[in-house]
């Protein structure tokens, strides 16, 4: 995954020859990210996801505390040192997390019924490497839903036919407007409209709730600034 400011800016540079000398509004700011500090060599990227109905305060490593829950499901990806354990704080209580591989992106899923339990670790790799595409990643975190499904609204094309409970799947897409629904069995969520994604963007779609009352929410993925 290429979520940190430097790879994202490099993806924009790959598009620059197509644009000639004209620069759309806001592009100068994006290209300026090239000059932002890079994460240290050997870094890994970790975020925490809360699929529950109650918000919790969470911090990863040296990152700032963030509130995650129904309004915002996941934290930003925090930068941690790969190959070494790191600290996680949930509702003010610190805990040590096992090491993660350098260069990897991971999502740690809280158990909303028991936040003190070990977190489910999901690897967020294996997505698109095409700089001309955006990436969407679908997480099946609905209770009692052995196979989650994501499709275009109004009985449109199926995007992910069967994502196992407690797992995710990703694919590259052309940045287009779309309305998506998710569900389990014969039940579907309310539709969610994709935002105006740019090439190189990564967008998460979370299926929460239950098999009988599925909820679909989306969130643009991002990383903490270097040094936070």
Tell where the protein language model's regions lie, with residue ranges:
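Bacterial N-terminal signal peptides that target proteins for export
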Residues: 1-8
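Intrinsically disordered, low-complexity polar regions and short flexible loop motifs
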Residues: 23-228
């Amino acid at each position: 995954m290429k979520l940190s400011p430097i790879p994202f800016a490099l993806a924009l540079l790959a598009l620059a020859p197509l644009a000639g000398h004209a620069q759309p509004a806001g592009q100068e700011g994006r290209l300026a990210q090239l000059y932002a500090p890079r994460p240290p060599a050997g870094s890994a990227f970790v975020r925490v996801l809360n699929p529950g109905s109650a918000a919790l305060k969470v911090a990863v490593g040296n990152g700032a505390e963030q509130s995650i829950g129904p309004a915002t499901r996941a934290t930003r990806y925090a930068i941690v040192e790969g190959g070494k354990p790191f600290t996680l704080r949930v509702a003010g209580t610190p805990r040590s997390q096992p090491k993660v591989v350098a260069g990897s992106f991971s999502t740690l899923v809280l158990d909303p019924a028991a936040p003190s339990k070990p977190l489910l670790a999901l690897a967020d790799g294996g997505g698109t490497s095409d700089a001309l595409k955006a990436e969407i990643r679908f997480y099946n975190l609905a209770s009692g839903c052995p196979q989650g499904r994501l499709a275009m609204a109004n009985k449109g094309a199926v995007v992910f036919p069967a994502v196992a409970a407690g797992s995710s799947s990703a694919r590259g897409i052309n940045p287009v407007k779309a309305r998506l629904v998710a569900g389990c069995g014969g039940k579907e969520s309310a539709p969610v409209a994709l935002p105006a994604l740019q090439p190189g963007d990564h967008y998460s779609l979370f299926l929460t709730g239950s098999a009988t009352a599925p909820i679909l929410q989306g969130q643009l993925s991002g990383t903490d600034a270097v040094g936070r």
